[in-house]
Amino acid sequence: MKAYELVVYPERCHGCGNCVVSCPVNAKHPETWGGKGPYSDDVVIRVENGVVTVVNQDLCGGCGACIEACPVNAIELVFKRK
């Protein structure tokens, strides 16, 4: 079990997709760079219905690229207490 969880605050998210493009896990999907969201479930996050959604928490490496890319602070890593 990871010591952190990627949390999205949908009320803040504008669905710009900056986080999706910045994620190194998502980068392996060519459609990410074409301006489309990845269709595979083998990604960490994607935009669905105008809001970023965590698709696969287990793939998140905790690098924080998505957090840095978000202009509205809609994403954060929440560290779990032991």
UniProtKB/Swiss-Prot annotation:
Keywords: 4Fe-4S, Iron, Iron-sulfur, Metal-binding, Repeat
Keyword Iron-sulfur (UniProt): yes
Highest taxon above the source species: Archaea
Gene3D superfamilies the UniProt entry points to: 3.30.70.20
Cofactor descriptive note: Binds 2 [4Fe-4S] clusters.
Molecular function terms, GO-annotated: 4 iron, 4 sulfur cluster binding; metal ion binding; oxidoreductase activity
Pfam family, one: Fer4_7
Entry binding sites for [4Fe-4S] cluster 2: C60, C63, C66, C70
Sites where the protein binds [4Fe-4S] cluster 1: C13, C16, C19, C23
Residues in 4Fe-4S ferredoxin-type domain copies: 4-33, 51-80
Cofactor(s), names only, from the UniProt record: [4Fe-4S] cluster
Protein name: Polyferredoxin protein FwdG
Lineage: Archaea, Methanobacteriati, Methanobacteriota, Methanomada group, Methanococci
